[in-house]
Amino acid sequence: MTILEFKRYFKSELSELYTEAESAQLYSIFLYEKTGFDRFQQRRFAHQELLISDEEELQEITSELKTGKPYQQILGHTEFYGKKFFVDENVLIPRPETEELVELAKIEIQNLKSKIQNLKLLDIGTGSGIIPITLKKHFPNSEISAMDISEKALEIAQKNADFHKKEINFIQADFLNTELTEKYDIIISNPPYIGIDENPEIEDSVKGFEPNIALFSPTSDALIFYKKIAKDGEKHLNENGMIFLEINQKLGKETLELFSNYSESRLIKDLSGNDRFVFAKK
């Protein structure tokens, strides 16, 4: 099979799942992954025969994509904030909104850094570790801890930290049943915020392939994590300490109200105009 023949096969097989533009992008991604050919070379060598091993692997990838499996899981990695991060079925695939959360935190932390030299930061529900590792890159002198209930998720997080050569204190714990013992300057979190009653609205490709424990609240209360974060923050944030949260866009006002006792709290929209973040300052 030539490269051009595979391209036609790939698009035909995935036509019911992806638009032509999406399948073209995926084709280029996976062909580059297997052959090393960039987009120009893919066109230039369109009539070149694929190695049998590459052809077999690409056909297997096509079959996996047809099941709805996210392409990032098939690749085994994705991009976040311009950097490569490993992912698998035990962690959520990073969304663009979480990049916005990190950007928001980065701007506010830069202002706080003039007052505090060695920041202490806690990430709750770290998953693949994208948030603490990215912030460590920007604030190398900070002391960062990251908590998750899943041992397998933390294995991926540690793999990412090792890959980026960043020291993060990973903690396996159930946050909802854990008493914090230290104080922090920053608490940041993108916790499970989808209510059980919203389950039918979630795409099958998400429900079927990404960890439900990272998506859905463990109870009917979609705000359960935010309530504990608000309570813990009152006790475990240092003076001028800040909280950054990614939230359920349908529960913006309700989430913001949890931080009414803080000196400052704001509901912030994402680039799509949805209520997506809450910022609070002690």
Range-by-range predicted roles:
Residues 141-142, 147-282:
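S-adenosylmethionine
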Residues 10, 101, 105-108, 229, ...:
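Generic hydrophobic alpha-helical segments
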Residues 45-46, 60-139, 144, 149-159, ...:
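SAM-dependent Rossmann-like transferase core, predominantly class I methyltransferases
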Residues 54, 94-97, 225:
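An acidic site on a long C-lobe helix of protein kinase domains
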Residues 5, 29, 97-100, 130, ...:
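Generic alpha-helical secondary structure signal
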Residues 1-17, 52-53, 60, 107-120, ...:
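Short, Lys/Arg-enriched, disordered terminal segments
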Residues 34, 38, 65, 69, ...:
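A general structural signal marking secondary-structure boundaries and capping sites
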Residues 1-75:
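N-terminal auxiliary segments of SAM/dcSAM-dependent transferases
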